[in-house]
Amino acid sequence: SELGIFVPMLVEAGVTSFHVTLANHSSLEDTIPPRNHPYFKDEGCFLKFCDEVRRYTDKPITGVGGLSDPDFVEEQLATGRIACAAMCRQLLADPEWPNKVAAGQCKEIHRCVRCNKKCLGGLQQHQGTHCIYEKG
Protein backbone atom coordinates (compact mmCIF):
# COMPACT_ATOMS: atom_id res chain seq x y z
CA SER A 1 0.00 0.00 0.00
CA GLU A 2 1.21 3.48 -0.84
CA LEU A 3 -0.15 4.66 2.52
CA GLY A 4 2.83 3.05 4.22
CA ILE A 5 5.05 5.43 2.28
CA PHE A 6 2.98 8.61 2.24
CA VAL A 7 1.52 8.72 5.75
CA PRO A 8 4.93 8.67 7.50
CA MET A 9 6.23 11.27 5.02
CA LEU A 10 3.28 13.54 5.78
CA VAL A 11 3.78 13.15 9.53
CA GLU A 12 7.47 13.93 9.11
CA ALA A 13 6.49 17.06 7.14
CA GLY A 14 4.34 18.25 10.04
CA VAL A 15 0.83 16.91 9.42
CA THR A 16 -0.91 16.68 12.79
CA SER A 17 -4.13 14.90 11.82
CA PHE A 18 -5.79 13.14 8.90
CA HIS A 19 -9.26 13.58 7.38
CA VAL A 20 -9.81 10.30 5.57
CA THR A 21 -12.30 10.13 2.73
CA LEU A 22 -12.57 8.82 -0.79
CA ALA A 23 -12.83 10.60 -4.11
CA ASN A 24 -13.24 9.11 -7.54
CA HIS A 25 -13.64 11.97 -9.94
CA SER A 26 -14.78 9.70 -12.75
CA SER A 27 -17.75 8.56 -10.65
CA LEU A 28 -19.50 11.03 -8.37
CA GLU A 29 -21.56 8.17 -6.91
CA ASP A 30 -18.32 6.63 -5.58
CA THR A 31 -17.37 9.93 -3.95
CA ILE A 32 -20.83 10.70 -2.54
CA PRO A 33 -22.42 7.25 -2.46
CA PRO A 34 -26.18 6.73 -2.30
CA ARG A 35 -27.47 4.15 0.18
CA ASN A 36 -27.89 1.54 -2.58
CA HIS A 37 -24.25 1.77 -3.70
CA PRO A 38 -22.84 -1.76 -4.15
CA TYR A 39 -19.68 -1.11 -2.07
CA PHE A 40 -20.50 1.82 0.22
CA LYS A 41 -24.01 1.18 1.53
CA ASP A 42 -23.36 0.82 5.27
CA GLU A 43 -23.20 3.40 8.05
CA GLY A 44 -19.63 4.69 8.21
CA CYS A 45 -18.94 3.38 4.73
CA PHE A 46 -15.48 5.00 4.48
CA LEU A 47 -14.23 4.10 7.98
CA LYS A 48 -12.36 1.09 6.64
CA PHE A 49 -10.02 3.61 5.00
CA CYS A 50 -9.44 5.22 8.40
CA ASP A 51 -8.42 1.79 9.65
CA GLU A 52 -5.83 1.58 6.87
CA VAL A 53 -4.37 5.00 7.71
CA ARG A 54 -4.32 4.04 11.42
CA ARG A 55 -1.85 1.25 10.59
CA TYR A 56 0.76 3.94 9.86
CA THR A 57 0.11 6.72 12.38
CA ASP A 58 -1.12 7.51 15.85
CA LYS A 59 -2.23 11.01 14.80
CA PRO A 60 -5.93 11.91 15.17
CA ILE A 61 -8.13 10.71 12.32
CA THR A 62 -11.39 12.27 11.17
CA GLY A 63 -13.82 9.81 9.62
CA VAL A 64 -16.62 10.48 7.18
CA GLY A 65 -19.07 8.53 5.07
CA GLY A 66 -22.72 7.95 5.79
CA LEU A 67 -22.53 8.85 9.47
CA SER A 68 -25.99 9.55 10.87
CA ASP A 69 -26.67 7.22 13.80
CA PRO A 70 -25.59 8.86 17.08
CA ASP A 71 -24.91 5.53 18.81
CA PHE A 72 -22.75 4.32 15.93
CA VAL A 73 -20.81 7.60 15.83
CA GLU A 74 -20.30 7.54 19.60
CA GLU A 75 -18.99 3.97 19.42
CA GLN A 76 -16.42 4.95 16.77
CA LEU A 77 -15.28 7.89 18.89
CA ALA A 78 -15.26 5.93 22.18
CA THR A 79 -13.18 3.09 20.75
CA GLY A 80 -10.67 5.52 19.25
CA ARG A 81 -11.33 4.37 15.72
CA ILE A 82 -11.77 8.05 14.87
CA ALA A 83 -11.08 11.23 16.83
CA CYS A 84 -13.67 13.29 14.97
CA ALA A 85 -16.76 12.52 12.91
CA ALA A 86 -17.30 14.66 9.82
CA MET A 87 -20.78 14.95 8.39
CA CYS A 88 -22.14 16.73 5.37
CA ARG A 89 -25.37 15.26 4.05
CA GLN A 90 -26.52 14.38 7.57
CA LEU A 91 -26.16 18.02 8.62
CA LEU A 92 -28.09 19.09 5.53
CA ALA A 93 -30.85 16.66 6.52
CA ASP A 94 -30.88 17.98 10.09
CA PRO A 95 -28.62 20.91 10.98
CA GLU A 96 -29.68 20.45 14.62
CA TRP A 97 -28.18 16.92 14.80
CA PRO A 98 -25.43 17.87 17.28
CA ASN A 99 -27.85 19.79 19.51
CA LYS A 100 -30.44 17.02 19.45
CA VAL A 101 -27.81 14.42 20.34
CA ALA A 102 -26.51 16.58 23.20
CA ALA A 103 -30.06 17.09 24.48
CA GLY A 104 -30.86 13.38 24.30
CA GLN A 105 -33.42 13.94 21.54
CA CYS A 106 -32.06 11.34 19.12
CA LYS A 107 -35.54 10.16 18.12
CA GLU A 108 -36.21 13.67 16.81
CA ILE A 109 -33.34 13.54 14.31
CA HIS A 110 -34.15 13.60 10.60
CA ARG A 111 -31.74 10.94 9.39
CA CYS A 112 -30.11 11.34 6.01
CA VAL A 113 -31.41 8.57 3.77
CA ARG A 114 -28.56 9.13 1.30
CA CYS A 115 -30.90 9.53 -1.65
CA ASN A 116 -28.74 12.31 -3.19
CA LYS A 117 -31.87 13.88 -4.70
CA LYS A 118 -31.64 17.49 -3.54
CA CYS A 119 -28.14 17.66 -2.08
CA LEU A 120 -26.14 16.15 -4.94
CA GLY A 121 -28.95 16.48 -7.48
CA GLY A 122 -29.48 20.14 -6.69
CA LEU A 123 -25.76 20.77 -6.92
CA GLN A 124 -25.50 19.05 -10.29
CA GLN A 125 -28.47 21.04 -11.61
CA HIS A 126 -27.08 24.36 -10.30
CA GLN A 127 -30.02 24.71 -7.90
CA GLY A 128 -28.00 24.81 -4.72
CA THR A 129 -27.55 22.20 -2.05
CA HIS A 130 -30.72 21.26 -0.19
CA CYS A 131 -32.39 18.26 1.41
CA ILE A 132 -35.65 16.42 0.78
CA TYR A 133 -36.53 17.17 4.43
CA GLU A 134 -36.52 20.94 3.96
CA LYS A 135 -39.85 22.59 4.45
CA GLY A 136 -41.35 24.91 1.91
Regions found by a protein language model. Name each.
Residues 1-136:
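Flavin-dependent oxidoreductase catalytic cores
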